[in-house]
Amino acid sequence: MIEICCGSYEDALNAYYGGAKRIELNSALHLGGLTPSIGSLKLTKNTTNLKVICMVRPRGAGFCYTDIEFKQMMIEAKDLLENGADGIAFGFLLKNNEIDIERTKEMVSLIKSYQKEAVFHRAYDCVKDPYASIEILINLGIDRLLTSGLRAKAADGKDLIKKLQTKYGDKIEILAGSGINSTNGQAIMEYTGIAQIHSSCKDWQNDQTTSGEFVNYCYGPAEHKDDFDMVSKELVEKLVKLGL
């Protein structure tokens, strides 16, 4: 299974026409992915047969949220589930980088009340003890874990991913993500034994209105100073053609 990380409805269409079957729908991917709009979800569900896992994340940076942020996240998750989300991707950590059990339990309970999938995202890659943490997630009813093996890129964390798959793969789905593409996806899957990968298939598109004479809304690297990132249908096709 190949899951494409999308930041908009247009990204979702590119993933769909590239042959993807499942996406993680976000907004603001340059911040690591934030909660998508209801509009992008409804359009995706109304015009494609994609399975859509929606991110619920109110801001960039870490995963230890205030009570106000948590309340917002629960309301957004409910709204997304009410409007057709096939699952919710989320992550809660305590200040000491351990899993926030109570908040995770509450979110899982909400998701399961709609009979949808609970996915714990790469907040997991900030924990100190990957084995104790995944056991907590399993006991809380998490269906799938997105991880890069606690490294910046999944290729560098493949040894841990393999160990997690070997030890826990019959209890929780392991989804490898970060830096995966058509050149390394198959090798990572074969090495680790996992059956799922997560990829952004990212390319850049120019928008000259990014810069004015005295202002600049650029967020990309210098070579893409007037560009925004988007899913490339062609890169999705290359990944899908591997038959993973």
State the predicted function of each range.
Residues 2-6, 23-25, 52-56, 88-90, ...:
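Hydrophobic faces of well-ordered beta-strands that scaffold small-molecule active sites
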Residues 60, 168-244:
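C-terminal alpha-helical cap/extension of soluble enzyme domains
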Residues 10, 29-48, 68, 93-111, ...:
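Active-site-adjacent beta->alpha loops and helix N-cap segments on the catalytic face
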Residues 39, 44, 50-104:
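Glycine/small-residue-rich loop that forms an oxyanion/phosphate-binding "nest" at active or ligand-binding sites
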Residues 24-34, 79, 83-95, 142-155, ...:
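Glycine-rich phosphate-binding active-site loops on the catalytic face of alpha/beta enzymes
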Residues 18-23, 48-50, 84-87, 113-115, ...:
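Glycine-enriched alpha-helix->loop->beta-strand junction motifs that scaffold or abut catalytic
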Residues 15, 80, 107, 121, ...:
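Conserved, mostly hydrophobic/aromatic
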Residues 7-14, 64-76, 125-140, 164, ...:
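Catalytic cores of alpha/beta
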